[in-house]
Amino acid sequence: MVVSLTDVKSGSRVMVARIRGGLGIRQRLSCLGIHPGDIILLQKSGFMRGPVLVNVHGNQVALGRGIAAKILVEVKL
């Protein structure tokens, strides 16, 4: 099932299915090392409107909730 990154529980491993949004969003996430097909670990999803902290390719990346909501993922067991 494909859901938004903001809907996933902390500690979950997910695969990036696709990225919603325009070229600017896709380029920004690409510069941060986030691409469709990548496996990322959701380390912390801030309560309410806080940032989302993920680990991708061994690097910690903090994302605003608006950008995190544009990342559609599949939860990996």
Residue ranges and their predicted role:
Residues 1-77:
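Compact, glycine-rich, soluble single-domain proteins
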